Amino acid sequence: MTRKTIIVGVSGASCSGKSTLCQLLHAIFEGSSLVHEDDFYKTDAEIPVKNGIADWDCQESLNLDAFLENLHYIRDHGVLPTHLRNRENKNVAPEALIEYADIIKEFKAPAIPTLEQHLVFVDGFMMYVNEDLINAFDIRLMLVTDFDTLKRRREARTGYITLEGFWQDPPHYFENYVWPGYVHGHSHLFVNGDVTGKLLDKRIQLSPSSKMSVRDNVQWAINSILNALQ
């Protein structure tokens, strides 16, 4: 019997912890799949340039049409397309799985029930920016944002591997590009456009606090998923 596929979005601003959370959920829920929106970045030459600087943190830096097509493929076929299966674990940071091995052990079956559904976890920073994308997910999780924490985490990163090279943020990149890009893509989801405030869109579940530990985020996400599947 073919299991029903449930697509679970895990979104949030850059450095909100969404990728770590997605990796841990993938490790906890046996038989699940993992998709990274980052795999849909455009080539380096296609990244929009604003004020002479490449803007990797705007919607236009991603091929969202291809991303949506792949989500529809997963919905229709119940499996990841070959090119995503081949990349499924390439963006996984093994150090995170080692660092949080105790959390995986705590929540892994039999601590949680074995599900009849095939869960596909999708992590990305621009996943709820329009209705077509929002509707592509069955469960929509979002990590709450905190400007100062995100800025500190982003500026602590050494850089990013791109399709064709390596990118390192220039000074003041977070406040001039990363944060404005996130606000532009998500303000429509929040009361008065305040992305640090309350959600207007009840289809999306927002984590209770930006101060939650990794374990608390995992607990919240698992509870949200299991409740949605009831």
Swiss-Prot record:
Gene3D superfamilies: P-loop containing nucleotide triphosphate hydrolases
Keywords: ATP-binding, Kinase, Magnesium, Metal-binding, Nucleotide-binding, Pyridine nucleotide biosynthesis, Transferase
Swiss-Prot/TrEMBL catalytic activity: beta-nicotinamide D-riboside + ATP = beta-nicotinamide D-ribonucleotide + ADP + H(+); beta-D-ribosylnicotinate + ATP = nicotinate beta-D-ribonucleotide + ADP + H(+)
Domain of life assignment: Eukaryota
GO BP term, example: nicotinamide riboside metabolic process
Entry GO CC: cytoplasm; cytosol; nucleus
Entry-linked InterPro entries: P-loop_NTPase
Amino acids binding ATP: 12-20, 153, 157-159, 203-205
Positions bound to substrate: D38, D39, F40, Y41, W56, D57, R154, G159, Y160
Cell membrane as UniProt keyword: no
EC number: 2.7.1.22, 2.7.1.173
Keyword Cell division recorded: no
Residues engaged in binding Mg(2+): S19, D38
Pathway info: Cofactor biosynthesis; NAD(+) biosynthesis
Residues annotated as the enzyme's active site: D38
One Gene Ontology term of the molecular function aspect: ribosylnicotinamide kinase activity
Function: Catalyzes the phosphorylation of nicotinamide riboside (NR) and nicotinic acid riboside (NaR) to form nicotinamide mononucleotide (NMN) and nicotinic acid mononucleotide (NaMN).
Family the entry assigns: Belongs to the uridine kinase family. NRK subfamily.
The name this protein goes by in its record: Nicotinamide riboside kinase
Organism: Schizosaccharomyces pombe (strain 972 / ATCC 24843)
Gene designation per UniProt: nrk1
